[in-house]
Amino acid sequence: MTISAVPGTIILAIETSCDETGVGIACLDDYGTVTLLADEVASSVDEQARFGGVVPEIASRAHLEALGPTIRCALAAAGLTGSAKPDVVAATIGPGLAGALLVGVAAAKAYSAAWGVPFYAVNHLGGHLAADVYEHGPLPECVALLVSGGHTHLLQVRSLGAPIVELGSTVDDAAGEAYDKVARLLGLGYPGGKVLDDLARTGDRDAIVFPRGMTGPADDLNAFSFSGLKTAVARYVESHPDALPADVAAGFQEAVADVLTMKAVRAATGLGVSTLLIVGGVAANSRLRELAAQRCAAAGLMLRIPGPRFCTDNGAMIAAFAAHLLAAAAPPSPLDVPSDPGLPVVKRQIN
């Protein structure tokens, strides 16, 4: 594919919020359709696994080493060769690891200045919401459950170009964080999500019933808590040394999926929307996807979950979110805008 054959606005986006170096290139056409042209990801997860979690300094150095080659691969894959260049450059401005964000933001600003094109500083979490459009088309009004290693949010999304309303979030650990901690407890290593999911498939999810946090009559309907669940698993393993790890994993995973899907479906039906969107790294979990499909079908909701490729961090999702901001006539960001490691989910862009 050559760039001259692709009409529309070409967006190059950089994602470096954690341990994946992602570069995505997408095209926004005159009808608002977003088409993915390139999606390249380099990960430092193997280096991080030696330490049982993400080490910020290692992540930052890995981004420095990987970003140049990853950008060149993406440009070549999209057909941006010779003097061809994108029309817009975007980057994750937050939330994320401070040093990791700086690498991607600095590179994006430099390319924006060198090419003389606008720069968009966008929210990483908004990118997760937008990732689904590549596979399932324009996103209707929905309730979104965003679950990842560092975040667990229930959101009302009227459109990807409109302000996002936060309905609730975790009061302690994120769901993905709990997965990593329980996986470490069971000696499964890091990252814990996929390996724990694989182990849980071989266990009996009804053998051990773990507590469901924030589900009491006095609890916030849209809030989550996974710290108590993590502690309950630790105490169970300590007091039952002969327990099958697969049953522990299955019981833990069932508790997480039960709470997430129950609260998400209830929020969607309560607001009268017809679509539930589930995104983020934890959205790749097989039991969460299965239980969400069952409960959405029972409630008459349309369920949208991107494929596992678009659940984890990547540049394609940042390009998609930037495209929707462009379509909504959002102004570009100044080149002196700082990154924000604690950027709230409701702040779509810094400009």
From Swiss-Prot:
Described purpose of this protein according to its UniProt entry: Required for the formation of a threonylcarbamoyl group on adenosine at position 37 (t(6)A37) in tRNAs that read codons beginning with adenine. Is involved in the transfer of the threonylcarbamoyl moiety of threonylcarbamoyl-AMP (TC-AMP) to the N6 group of A37, together with TsaE and TsaB. TsaD likely plays a direct catalytic role in this reaction.
Family named by the database record: Belongs to the KAE1 / TsaD family.
Protein localization: Cytoplasm
Chief localisation class: cytoplasm
InterPro entries membership: ATPase_NBD (IPR043129), Gcp-like_dom (IPR000905), KAE1/TsaD (IPR017861), Peptidase_M22_CS (IPR017860), TsaD (IPR022450)
PROSITE patterns: GLYCOPROTEASE
UniProt EC number: 2.3.1.234
Note accompanying the cofactor annotation: Binds 1 Fe(2+) ion per subunit.
GO molecular function: iron ion binding; N(6)-L-threonylcarbamoyladenine synthase activity
Gene field: tsaD
The reaction(s) this protein catalyses: L-threonylcarbamoyladenylate + adenosine(37) in tRNA = N(6)-L-threonylcarbamoyladenosine(37) in tRNA + AMP + H(+)
One annotated Gene Ontology cellular component of this protein: cytoplasm
Protein name: tRNA N6-adenosine threonylcarbamoyltransferase
Swiss-Prot/TrEMBL keywords: Acyltransferase, Cytoplasm, Iron, Metal-binding, Transferase, tRNA processing
Positions annotated to bind substrate: L146, V147, S148, G149, G150, D180, G193, D197, N285
Transferase in keyword set: yes
NCBIfam families xref list: gcp_kae1, T6A_TsaD_YgjD
Residues annotated as binding Fe cation: H124, H128, D313
GO terms, biological process: tRNA threonylcarbamoyladenosine modification
Pfam families per the UniProt record, alphabetical: TsaD
